[in-house]
Amino acid sequence: MVIVMEIYEGKAKKVIPLDDGKVIIEFKDDATAFNGKKKAQFKGKGWLNAQISAILFKVLEEKGIKTHFIGVAGDNKLIVEKLKMYPVEVVVRNVIAGSLKKRLPLKEGTELSEPIVELYYKNDDLGDPMINHYHAKVLGVSERELKEIENIALKVNNILKEYFAQRGIILVDFKLEFGKNERGEIILGDEISPDTCRFWDAETKESLDKDVFRFDKGELINAYEELYKRLTA
């Protein structure tokens, strides 16, 4: 495997393409919040996010969800299948929290009777605005693709809700990204980590995710380590 070039460096990851249809995702120790207005570094965060993502991708693969995950390529690196990513993020919400509490007249922590699926346009300059199917189709995502993406997202939710519940964790909400592989299959990509999910302790409702950093709730690394411990116990 030969590195071709570094094609992308985001706020929390580097994406490095190889010459064999694979990609390395390198998780950084950087943490950002509020569209990059709040920044910090936490030693070990990249390792934790890589390991947690690997665990969760394996869980999903075992349940029949196709993901881009191939293996762990180092302490803070994953090797994954190269995908052509959709310009849309999918957010699945099970509990009133985050931005949803500003849009619905319900108390934070209220469990939803059924999950809410939201779409967002991946564009930092525009602040990743919420969109609907009509907007997504303008961006080149067909109705058939949208339905398949949303169906996969709901299956992921069912699998992970049960998985985390067994470990004393509430899966409040989470973000997914999808792409197409060379065979034209829609595949789950990106990461599944406390950077992209909202996790609460089932008893105390304490955050085990980036909200700890975002809202100064404590030590981010302690929260991520606690999550990792529960996944590996």
Curated annotation (Swiss-Prot):
InterPro entries linked to this entry: SAICAR_synt/ADE2_N (IPR028923), SAICAR_synt_PurC (IPR033934), SAICAR_synth (IPR001636), SAICAR_synthetase (IPR050089), SAICAR_synthetase_CS (IPR018236)
Enzyme Commission identifier(s)? 6.3.2.6
Write down the chemical reaction(s) this protein catalyses: 5-amino-1-(5-phospho-D-ribosyl)imidazole-4-carboxylate + L-aspartate + ATP = (2S)-2-[5-amino-1-(5-phospho-beta-D-ribosyl)imidazole-4-carboxamido]succinate + ADP + phosphate + 2 H(+)
Q: Looking at the record's lineage, which domain of life comes first?
A: Archaea
Keywords (alphabetical) are: ATP-binding, Ligase, Nucleotide-binding, Purine biosynthesis
Biological process, per Gene Ontology = 'de novo' IMP biosynthetic process; cobalamin biosynthetic process
Q: What class of enzyme is it?
A: ligase
Q: In which pathway does it act?
A: Purine metabolism; IMP biosynthesis via de novo pathway; 5-amino-1-(5-phospho-D-ribosyl)imidazole-4-carboxamide from 5-amino-1-(5-phospho-D-ribosyl)imidazole-4-carboxylate: step 1/2
Per the record, a Pfam family? SAICAR_synt
What the entry lists under PROSITE patterns is as follows: SAICAR_SYNTHETASE_1 (PS01057), SAICAR_SYNTHETASE_2 (PS01058)
Which Gene Ontology molecular-function terms are recorded?
ATP binding; phosphoribosylaminoimidazolesuccinocarboxamide synthase activity
Please report which protein family the annotation says this sequence is part of: Belongs to the SAICAR synthetase family.
Name listed for the protein in its UniProt record: Phosphoribosylaminoimidazole-succinocarboxamide synthase
